[in-house]
Amino acid sequence: MEEIVKFLKEAETYYLATVEGDQPRVRPFGTAHIFEGKLYIQTGKKKDVSKQLHANPKAELCAFKGGEWIRVAGELLEDDRIEARESMLDAYPALKKMYAADDGNTEVFYFKNGVATISSFTHEPKVINF
C-alpha cells in the first residue's frame, strides 16, 4: 500500500470518479494517507462527492506521473472516528485552514476491497490488491 500512496503523492493530483444516479462525476483530489493499514482520502460532508459516496461507495481514482499511471478501484467507506480525521489533518496541515477534526464537516473515507493497477506503455501492469 505504501507504493500506492507514494505514487499518488508524487503525482500530487489524482482524479476521483464517483457516480450520481447514472452520471459519472470526476474531480481532482490530493489527499492520500495510510491510517491503521488502510488507504484514506479526505473531503467535506457538504460536498457533492460526499453525498455520492454515501449513495454508492464504488469509486475509482486515476493519476499519471513520469510515463506511468495508476488506477485504484474499490469501495470508499466513511470512518467517522475523530482519530482518523485528526490523522489525516496532521498529514496535511494545510487543510487545517479549511477543516478541523471536530467541525462537523471534515470527512475521511478508506478503501475497502481495493485494487490498484500501475501501468505504462513499456511494461506489464502491476496489480496490488489491498
Model regions and ranges:
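General beta-strand recognition
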Residues: 15, 39-40, 60, 71, ...
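A short mixed-secondary-structure module that forms the rim of ligand-binding clefts
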Residues: 32-67
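A short, Trp-centered hydrophobic/proline-enriched beta-strand micro-motif
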Residues: 6-20, 59-61
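Absolute protein N-terminus
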Residues: 1-3
